[in-house]
């Protein structure tokens, strides 16, 4: 035991000058930190404040009323006579929203233009709208106006579905369609309430259709390029700061199927252009 003690003492004494020498050469260096709170950087894409607010909605409804209600078609071709839209009473969005509120939902999306191009408000962008409806109830219909007013009255979130694809428009597939029809429609819808939480742009883009009597197939390629998404996003967010753009626009997307199957934990790992 004594031999071990002597050996350790000798080692400690022999190391002392080395440690002392190293300490005399050590000095602190000042450094400016760009991250003063020492927060770790993101590992994956992070949700924006707008996306987080959208996520808090949790459970909301989708109201698909329009020309398809009277043609009994899932997707209209765009050649439907406007007079077919002839409701026997004034549509009542407040009744719709009261029903979903009773179910515990926090809001709803109203389809105001599907792929057939028929607009449920008196738009200046096309004649394929309620302006030429088959009766007075139809011609007086303005779903964006009445849906927004009802949602605000009930304290619910609201937004609109507007299809980028337009099987009625003779301009579809051209730059003029994007500028004079689609973007104008989005701008009009934005005027129906700056507190909209979502604008839904369907992923179905291009295919066969009426197209003003051309009856052909049109493919537009990359939707983000054709619909001028940077301009669309900036224009919408300038007026609707909390409005998430679903589908075209890249802030929210479908789960990958129309049956509603999803993993227990699911978060989009892509950025706005993926």
Describe the role of every protein-language-model region.
Residues 1-27:
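Bacterial Sec-dependent N-terminal signal peptides
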Residues 26-274:
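Mature catalytic domains of secreted/periplasmic carbohydrate-active enzymes
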């Amino acid at each position: 035991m004594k031999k071990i003690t002597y050996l350790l003492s000798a080692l400690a004494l022999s190391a002392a000058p080395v440690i002392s020498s190293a300490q005399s050469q050590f000095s602190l260096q000042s450094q400016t930190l760009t991250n003063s709170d020492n927060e770790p950087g993101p590992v994956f894409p992070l949700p924006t404040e707008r996306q987080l607010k959208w996520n808090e909605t949790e459970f909301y409804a989708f109201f698909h009323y329009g020309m398809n209600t009277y043609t009994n078609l899932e997707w209209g071709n765009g050649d439907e006579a406007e007079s077919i839209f002839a409701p026997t009473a004034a549509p009542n969005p407040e009744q719709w929203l009261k029903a979903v509120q009773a179910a515990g939902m926090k809001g709803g999306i109203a389809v105001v233009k599907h792929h057939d191009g028929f607009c449920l408000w008196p738009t200046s962008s096309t004649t394929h709208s309620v302006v030429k409806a088959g009766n007075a109830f139809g011609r007086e219909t303005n779903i964006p106006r009445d849906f927004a007013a009802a949602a605000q009255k009930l304290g619910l979130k609201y937004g609109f579905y507007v299809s980028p694809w337009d099987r009625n428009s003779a301009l579809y597939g051209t730059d003029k369609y994007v500028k004079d029809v689609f973007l104008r429609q989005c701008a009009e819808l934005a005027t129906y309430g700056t507190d909209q939480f979502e604008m839904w742009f369907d992923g179905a883009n291009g295919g066969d259709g009426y197209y003003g009597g051309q009856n052909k197939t049109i493919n537009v390629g990359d939707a983000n390029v054709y619909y001028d998404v940077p301009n669309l996003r900036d224009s919408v967010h300038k007026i609707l700061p909390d409005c998430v753009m679903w589908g075209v626009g890249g802030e929210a997307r479908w789960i990958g199927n129309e049956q509603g199957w999803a993993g227990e934990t699911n978060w989009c790992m892509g950025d706005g252009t993926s």
